[in-house]
Amino acid sequence: MMKGQLAGLMRQAQQMQENMKKAQDALAEIQVEGAAGGGLVKVTMTCRHDVKRVAIDASLLGEDKDMLEDLVAAAFNDALRKAEATSQEKMASVTAGMPLPPGMKLPF
């Protein structure tokens, strides 16, 4: 490989690394909301999986504890799926044209 080609590859790798960092920083700011029980339980989290808020409608507070726990878990899982989908969309633009093994998720 010629020296010029290697330098070009190094520049591309550095640019991709910078773009990846910017995308990860942006994902830390994007919030998604998961819901369960027709919106009576809501979980808000970032696309980096930091839970920011759990909202439980007051009408559920006197209800069955097991049901409430199930609704919180379902809302969390809904938010997690939305965060993953949003992350994949955002990272796809960064990794476009980059050959990745099947099933490999970014960010690592």
From Swiss-Prot:
The keyword DNA-binding applies. SUPFAM superfamilies: YbaB-like. GO terms for molecular function: DNA binding. Residues 87-108 are annotated as: Disordered. Residues 99-108 have a biased composition (Pro residues). Its main location: cytoplasm. Keywords: Cytoplasm, DNA-binding. One of its GO terms (cellular component) is bacterial nucleoid. Belongs to the YbaB/EbfC family. Binds to DNA and alters its conformation. May be involved in regulation of gene expression, nucleoid organization and DNA protection. NCBIfam families: DNA_YbaB_EbfC. HAMAP family: DNA_YbaB_EbfC. Homodimer. This is Nucleoid-associated protein BP1550. It comes from Bordetella pertussis (strain Tohama I / ATCC BAA-589 / NCTC 13251). The lineage of its organism: Bacteria, Pseudomonadati, Pseudomonadota, Betaproteobacteria, Burkholderiales.
